[in-house]
């Protein structure tokens, strides 16, 4: 079970605290960051780490722990902020993000950061590995679940769809794929670069059980994830999000894919994220 199991209100407060960490972390990075991608995933990560995952930071080698894979590796900054808030890594590591010899590199690296299960960043790799882990869990009789978060533009990588076919073939109902559908990627709007809509129909055609939620609404995310039951099919949650969610001048702005807040922007963002 989850060691925190927070209420909806408590999860909302955690999400806001993680967003504040994201602002400061990116502002202090010597090598830029991915502020928009970090922010769009916050409610998803918060729901998983503080309510849904059977994963304890004090027992990282438990063979029955649920596995979470951050396939959208460019969202590493937000991922680290969540790991710090949840007690997987020390808070004082966050100011070292992307510094030389840091344990928090620009994309997740398993042997450097406690809690990270897979090196990611080259898009389209996380889901295939998650499928392999789900197959292994089935074969060994494990009850663990495998969760993987994919980006929106990431679904343009064909390896995801090969993995989906395999997941359906092996009836991996212990696999939960979450799409952070924020409608943007590095070069602009996903629909203008390589449109994957209607995404629900595509996943269904590949043999998935499809769920949908408002990905920046804690209650919607939690209720959707907790409603998933084994039924012989892999599960996909299309989480409709806003890139840069939570900060008005970042939301839905393509330039914030690789931009970080500076100067007055930091103060403005933190002002918007104050506890009420």
UniProtKB/Swiss-Prot annotation:
Catalytic activity: apulose 4-phosphate + D-glyceraldehyde 3-phosphate = D-xylulose 5-phosphate + dihydroxyacetone phosphate
Keywords on record: Carbohydrate metabolism, Thiamine pyrophosphate, Transferase
Pathway(s) this gene product operates in, as recorded in its UniProt entry: Carbohydrate metabolism
Gene3D superfamilies in alphabetical order: 3.40.50.970
Extent of the signal sequence: none
EC number(s) recorded for this UniProt protein: 2.2.1.13
InterPro entries on file: THDP-binding, Transketolase_N
One Pfam short name: Transketolase_N
Highest taxon, organism lineage: Bacteria
Example of a GO MF term: transferase activity
Cited SUPFAM superfamilies: Thiamin diphosphate-binding fold (THDP-binding) (SSF52518)
Names of the cofactor(s): thiamine diphosphate
Database matches in PANTHER family: TRANSKETOLASE N-TERMINAL SECTION-RELATED
Family: Belongs to the transketolase family.
Subunit structure: Probable heterodimer composed of AptA and AptB.
Function: Involved in catabolism of D-apiose. Catalyzes the transfer of the glycolaldehyde group from apulose-4-phosphate to D-glyceraldehyde 3-phosphate, generating dihydroxyacetone phosphate and D-xylulose-5-phosphate.
Descriptive protein name: Apulose-4-phosphate transketolase subunit A
Gene that produces this protein: aptA
